[in-house]
Amino acid sequence: CIRDRIVSALERFAPLPLQDGFDNAGLQVGLTEAEATGALLCLDVTEAVVDEAVMLGYNLIISHHPLIFKGYKSIIGRDYIERCVLKAIKNDIVIYSAHTNLDNAPGGVNYKIAEKIGLKNVRILDPKEEYLLKFVTFVPDAQADRVRKALFEAGCGCIGNYDSCSYNLEGEGTFRAQRGTSPFCGEIGELHKESEVRIETILPAFKKAAVIKALLATHPYEEPAFDFYPLKNTWTQVGSGVVGELEEPEAELDFLKRIKKTFEVGCLRHTRLSGRLIQKVALCGGAGAFLLPKAVSADADVFITGEVKYHDYFNYENDILVAEMGHYESEQYTKEIFYTIIR
C-alpha cells in the first residue's frame, strides 16, 4: 500500500523530525491504505496538478512544498488550497509533502543542486545542533553482542560515514531482586554481583523510542538500566545548505552563465562582479539568504540561493558573490530525488 511502500521509503530518506519548527511536512490529504495506481511528482500542489493526477488515474501526489501550512476551521473551496483538498478527497488522491525534512536530510535538495553544479567534497553548511543523544546501558557479558546489534539496527551508532560505533567497558553490576520478581540471574532477596558490559553509543533524538523498544526486546533483565544524555555536538550530516568545491576554478561571469543555463533561469540576479575566481560554492535551495553569514564564514566565493531580500545584497556584497536564481528554479530537480526514492 501507499503507506508501507512509498511513505515509509520517503520517511526513511527524510525523517519527519528533521523538518524545521514552522513546517508542515508529511501526509496532507487522504488515506494511505490503498495501493498506488501512480504518483505525480511536483514542487507545488496546484489545481492543475490535481487535475492532471485525476486525468492520468493516479492516486498519489508527492510535492516538495506542503499544500497546507495554516490551520483551517472549514474547507469550502475559498482558495486554491481548499479546492485542491476537496478535489483530492473527491477523487481518493493522497497528497504527501517532504519539505524542510528533505532540505535538511543527507542527499536531499541541496545535495541535488550541488550535483547539478558539479561540486565535490560536499558537506552541510549549517549542521543541526542538539539533535543527538548519548545512550548508555549495562548488559551481561554473554548477551552484550545481541543487545548491541539490536541497538545498531534501531538507529544507534552512526557517526559520519561510520556505523556500528560504540564504546564498551567491562565492569560489575549489583542488584537485589525483591519479592514478585523473576530475575535473570541471582536469587530473590540476596545481593547479586554480575559481570556486565557498559555499552555507550549515540543516536538521533527522534529514534529514542525505537531504541528503548529494541533494548527491552533483547535485554535479558526485567528492569534493564539505561541512560540518555543530551549532547551539544553538531550533527554534521544533517542541516541547512551545503558547501563544496568545483573541480577547477571558474571566472565569475562564466560560472553565472553556466548556472543560468543549467537551471534554465530567465534572469539571474547577483551582486557586482569583483573579478574573483569561483571555486568554493555555498548554496541553499529556496529562501536561503539566512545562511549568508555561514557562507561568508566558510570562505565561500559565491552563495547561490532561490530568494534574497533587497538589503541582503548590500550587507554582504564586499564579502562574497551572491546569486539569486529563483525559488522554483533552485528546487526544480527535487522531483528527481522523489523518483529515485520510490521507483
Predicted features by range, described:
Residues R3-R343:
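Active-site catalytic microenvironments in core metabolic enzymes, especially phosphate/sugar-handling
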